[in-house]
Amino acid sequence: MASERPRAAMIMAAGRGERMRPLTDTTPKPLLRVHGQPLIERHLERLVHAGIQRIVINLAWLGGQIRDYLADGTRYGAAITYSEEAPSALDAGGGVFRALPYLSPGPFAVVNGDSYTDFPFETLTIAGQYDSHLVLVPNPAYLQGDFGLARGEVLTRGEALARGTELFTFGGIAVYRNAFFAGAQDGVFPIMPLWQRSMAAGKCSGQLYSGVWEDVGTPERLDALNAARITT
């Protein structure tokens, strides 16, 4: 079936950032800077460069700072809509589900606001027979991997181990269709059960990306990233 590019994108920005404390006691994690630029601003600019101007950002912890910094997105060539989750974040599944009215019609991309990558968003697509598409990355030293990849489809960790295939880490970039969230209800819920359902049905495609990628999850990783020479 023909592949489609995402028509909109959501940047996940509502989390408390517990592992990044004390930095996140006063600054939301997506506004932490790598080489002088907030993580979320880099994602926004790269999405717009890839032709995705319709952007949704979910907010909870210190969300007002993100809104104040990015405003309506005009200066970036974007049209930003904010999805409020206060007083606390709805987890990944609940956060995206609440934002569906702003993202429809799909397909749409979802990007973790606390990652750093040079992934080329202009190449991101999803084929017609799938309801989800995950970008996987080689495992960093601090992770063992949660998913396998076989013939362009993502496998659960259990299935990958059973088949003896290599494990990879979710790279914080995905594409979804509305059908992926069938049966979900507004509230707090993780996205993993929906991934597992999609994988079991053979509806979750994937790709491996081996370029620049870092989960900026701790102060030590942030310091290391800022100390590194990065040209992207």
For the regions a language model picked out, list residue spans one by one.
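Conserved N-terminal catalytic core of the sugar/cofactor nucleotidyltransferase
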Residues: 1-11, 33, 37-112, 121, ...
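A phosphate-binding catalytic loop at a beta-strand-loop-alpha-helix junction
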Residues: 7-23
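Conserved beta-strand segments of alpha/beta enzyme cores
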Residues: 30, 79-81, 131, 203-205
